[in-house]
Amino acid sequence: MPKEFEAKFLNIDITSIKNKLRENGATKVHDPLKFYRLIFKRCEEAGDKPGFVRIRDEGKKITMTTKIFNDKKFPEEHEVTINESFEKGCEFLKAIGIQEKSYQETMREKWSHPLAHEITFDIVPGLPIYMEIDCTSEANLNKLVALLDLDKSNMKYGSFDKTYTKYYDIPSDNIIHKTPSLTFKDVGTQIKPNKNVSLFREITKLNKLIDERKMDTYYKKYKTLIYDKFLSETPGSESKTKSKNKRTRRHKKGRRNATHRRKSGI
């Protein structure tokens, strides 16, 4: 059965990575396109393996996909392109009794490379831009990661619900089962971050530019407000910094107490 050998890279310097892609033979397939998708639960008869069914409008085509997570890193995937509209695809799944879960919007810029099925830069409501590399084998994935000199500490697997957990400590279950809609216009009221609140606030402001189709302005402000200001450290660095500061304060307090004891003759 087909597997999807895919990895996400967070905290990316978009300009630098695109330059490396060009230097290593990659070409841009299309500029950012807005994707719309409706997520459905898999049939109960399919068993208890986690997964979903998706209808997605990719701007130039409509796809119907199912992903089955037998493997923590690389899910099993089956996908077909349908000739009917997005709405007709959704009607078909509802007609055969598959339950609708959520509606989601994303923006995607696609690149191609001989080692990859596709390389994408994804903009998801409320999240910093990340890159996804999708290959036909794990060996090709590792080769491309090395070729582009990507930071493996920022390499993540799985669907984007886990990315919300990484940046904002929002449980995956909240995104998968308790968020019926994720849109650029309203994400600020659709989910609530538990950390990195300032980052989330700035991202949601920028997301409104996407909804208004002001992509040039979005990218300029993203570089200044998000990458330079917030993403110099890995997701979760906020808590690491607090921990480091706490250790520093304990160390200084210990030194002061030792000095006091020496002066007091203790």
What are these regions (language model features)?
Residues 234-265:
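Arg/Lys-rich, intrinsically disordered low-complexity tails that mediate electrostatic binding
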Residues 72-74, 137, 261-262:
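Intrinsic-disorder/low-complexity, polar/charged segments
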